[in-house]
């Protein structure tokens, strides 16, 4: 059964992180620059939270906070749902759907080792389905 390790082999293990002292404005700029929807928040090499576009909308814009002076540590999601390298892709999809989240940090033996998104899960599933369709077409129609 395909697992998170398979996704990370395709996309890589780069993790974009910020410390709790980073301002919302700095985090938003980084997210925009890297074309990502969230950053993990780390302190002394430890995952302490996650900060996403949704947090910006709900906790900054909607509450009329100043992004230039508000640190992400005040607004980040502190209870972070994670997965492991061996978590099945199907289970990740279920977790993301039931928890209504789009980012899932991946924990390995030595701590944080990646982040997968709902888009990563969907892209992997689509690629697998396309491969299955190609195999079935080849079998049924003897296409080479």
PLM segments and residue spans:
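Tandem CBS (Bateman) regulatory domains
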Residues: 1-13, 52-82, 88-97, 118-144
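The conserved cystathionine-beta-synthase
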Residues: 17-35, 41, 82-100, 107
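Short, charge-rich amphipathic segments
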Residues: 22-33, 65-75, 110-111
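A glycine-centered beta-loop-beta connector
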Residues: 31-34, 39-55, 96, 104-119
